[in-house]
């Protein structure tokens, strides 16, 4: 983006002492959040939360040191958005896995400071002929990011047409831990899951999840909070979900 673009973004959406817009890694446009509770960096490409750290604490969101930052390329780490489908496309093998939302630009439509001092940004996906060729449905996607005592991310789709549509979406979040082999994950006990390392077989979780090798699973019908117990960083990360 040009300096004029940043000037316009900051004039309309910056919050003094909390939020501004600037070139980030690889020249990607980013929103930089620094408030009394936490710091965060969000790329406008993909409305992608790249980093989030509570004040005076290690990062909670992991960003790979080998991440590539380039227009149209997915960023390894952070919180990539999967939209409007999850996994491979149902009929078109040439379409990107997990959709295109994480590699296209999103526009800022609103910023605000909440009563507790948290910072909230609302992004809307920018669609063009290329995205409409893959997703020819009248719809809008919004990503609402709130950085405060907790990180809250809300993905919403609005059907702007008259026909019903079916979407798949997810946050493909990467969490920062000291040593994954020492971590335990609570809250998924008795949940069925698909084990993609074992050919997609359906299995059931017994007790906490531990990781000592390759793990690739899709847990089904999980509504409880999930706790990542990390003794190396002496903390627990709570993952809550709604919707």
What are these regions (language model features)?
Residues 1-76, 224-225, 230-243:
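Beta-strand-rich N-terminal accessory domains
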Residues 164-166, 170-243:
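Active-site/ligand-binding surface loops and adjacent short beta/alpha elements
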Residues 25, 95-147:
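Extended, loop-rich substrate-binding clefts of extracytoplasmic carbohydrate-active enzymes
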Residues 25-27, 36, 100-105, 137-139, ...:
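Residues that act as N-cap/strand-start positions at coil-to-secondary-structure junctions
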Residues 127-129, 145-149, 159-161, 173-177:
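Beta-strand elements of well-folded, non-transmembrane domains
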Residues 31, 40, 121-123, 141-143, ...:
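Hydrophobic residues positioned within well-ordered beta-strands of beta-sheet architectures
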Residues 42, 155-161:
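Asparagine-centered strand-capping/turn motif at beta-strand->loop junctions
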Residues 60-114, 123-124:
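Extended, compositionally biased flexible segments
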